[in-house]
A protein has these predicted regions:
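Active-site cleft segment of glycoside hydrolase catalytic domains centered on the general acid/base Glu
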Residues: 108-233, 240-254, 271, 275-291, ...
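Conserved, mostly hydrophobic/aromatic
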Residues: 86, 140, 162, 192, ...
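Bacterial N-terminal signal peptides that target proteins for export
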Residues: 1-9
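Beta-strand-rich binding/interaction modules
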Residues: 392-412
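Aromatic- and carboxylate-lined catalytic core of secreted/periplasmic carbohydrate-active enzymes
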Residues: 293-393, 425-426
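Bacterial N-terminal signal peptides
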Residues: 9-19
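N-terminal substrate-binding region of glycoside hydrolase catalytic domains
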Residues: 26-159, 163, 169, 173-175
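C-terminal beta-strand-rich structural cap/linker in extracellular carbohydrate-active enzymes
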Residues: 412-432
């Protein structure tokens, strides 16, 4: 409990923006990037150096009750501070709308048990006054849409992606993100979608992230989709916290297809490759991160948000609702040193950002591991082969080639001398 209190205080301090701001802003740069962090706030400088352009910040920042603490009285102080801070660091925001305000919850949810949160105890039921909630969403989106009307003073990076709550199927301590039925969440999703589009027709609505593909999780979401959810979001959203290098993508794509939503782009807004029950070294996790990101991009993921950028000073235990991560899977360790995962992330970004086409040569999944991966990524006017597994590369790779490993180290090698391992390499023909 003490650790949770310290962690809550850390979040509160960071929400208030009590840190130095560097100067930079180019609103278009990185908007189409595939790479982000949750949250980049823990280390903006290294998040950018690792190739990230997107932040999925603390949920409390865009919570109804944070911004409208009393009905009809808006206070954007903390949210504005965050938006100014994140845009000065050159990051775009995926904002997570939390549809909870204490004054509203008291109207019809006094029977619900209070849930611990960084902002105190609260209930997390469906809004009692849905029209008041929609009015809040309209005001929120209008403030950050960048249309010049009622915008935040100094807004440079408009917010164009709005996520509707988080893992609503998670309803048992120590992780309770929602207290309600699939129908309740569907009604929130529909109301939010309508309000977002009314305020900004160009904005995109992101489904609240699915916590995973366990049967009980899928059961909740199937009921949401049965009510017509696919009509009320633009981007599908999956999480994978230690679920394997496949990041739940094959089963999630199957689920979307079965629910007539296969045409929806999808993001993985929580990625963590550390397995709490099978600890590995940072070097092994770096290879795992590279395999999972390459696999995800090759299989259609549009954006990836890595969770364990850097550990906060005080992290609650797993029993207290903490994530159970360690320094083994951070990009920046507790001493501020860059880890092998940092370089693996950066190398994937440098090699594959802005690719326009990908072809699979070979792919093999076994349990949680992508045992083999061979792909052709087309970027600019060249082909980048990304390879791992066993044996030699495809015979179509001939002569001398440039080989880059996941640390970013480059060598010129004869193609017939290359032997694949479980650590991906990027192979490019040498331009004459």
């Amino acid at each position: 409990m003490k650790n949770l209190a310290k962690y809550s205080m850390l979040i509160f301090i960071m929400l208030c923006g009590l840190l130095v701001l560097p100067a930079q802003a180019n609103p278009e740069e990185g908007f189409n990037s595939s790479f982000g962090f949750m949250p980049a706030e823990f280390d903006f400088e290294h998040a950018r150096e690792a190739g990230g352009y997107w932040d999925r910040p603390f949920f409390e920042l865009f919570e109804w009750g944070t911004i409208e603490p009393e009905e009809g009285k808006f206070d954007f102080y903390m949210t504005d501070r965050y938006v100014r801070r994140v845009q000065e660091h050159g990051f775009h925001t995926l904002a997570n709308i939390q549809p909870f305000a204490n004054w509203d919850q008291k109207l019809c949810h006094e029977d619900l048990p209070g849930i611990r949160s960084p902002m105190g105890f609260q209930t997390k039921g469906k809004p009692c006054n849905m029209e008041a909630y929609k009015s809040f969403v309209i005001s929120l989106v209008e403030r950050y849409d960048g249309d010049g009307k009622d915008d935040m003073p100094g807004l440079k990076y408009p917010i164009k992606y709005w996520e509707v709550a988080n893992e609503p199927e998670m309803q048992e301590e120590p992780l309770v993100f929602f207290q309600g039925s699939p129908k309740d969440y569907f009604e929130i999703l529909k109301a939010t979608y309508e309000a977002v589009k009314e305020a900004d027709s160009e904005a995109q609505v992101v489904q609240g992230g699915m916590a995973g593909m366990a049967d009980w999780m899928v059961s909740f979401w199937q009921k949401v989709f049965d009510l017509g959810a696919a009509s009320y979001f633009d981007i599908a959203n999956m999480h994978s916290i230690g679920h394997g290098e496949h990041l739940n993508i094959p089963s999630f794509k199957k689920f979307l297809s079965e629910n007539n939503a296969s045409e929806k782009p999808f993001w993985i807004t929580e990625v963590q490759i550390e397995d709490r029950r099978d600890k590995k070294t940072s070097t092994e996790y770096a290879a795992s991160l590279a395999r999972s990101y390459i696999f995800a991009l090759a299989n259609g993921a549009r954006k990836l948000f890595y969770v364990n950028l850097r550990l906060p000073e005080h992290l609650p235990s797993q029993e207290e609702g903490g994530p159970g991560f360690s320094d083994l899977s951070t990009l920046v360790d507790s001493s501020g040193n860059l880890t092998p995962l940092f370089y693996a992330h950066l190398t994937v970004v440098l090699k594959l950002e802005d690719f326009h086409k990908v072809e699979k040569i070979k792919e093999k999944i076994s349990g949680k591991t992508i045992l083999e991966g061979q792909y052709r990524f087309f970027k600019d006017n060249r082909v980048i082969y990304v390879l791992w597994g066993k044996g030699s590369p495809s015979s179509e790779i001939e002569g001398e080639v440039k080989v880059t490993d996941i640390s970013g180290s480059e060598k010129i090698l004869a193609s017939d001398s290359i032997q694949l391992t479980n650590s991906p390499i990027f192979v490019e023909k040498i331009e004459l």
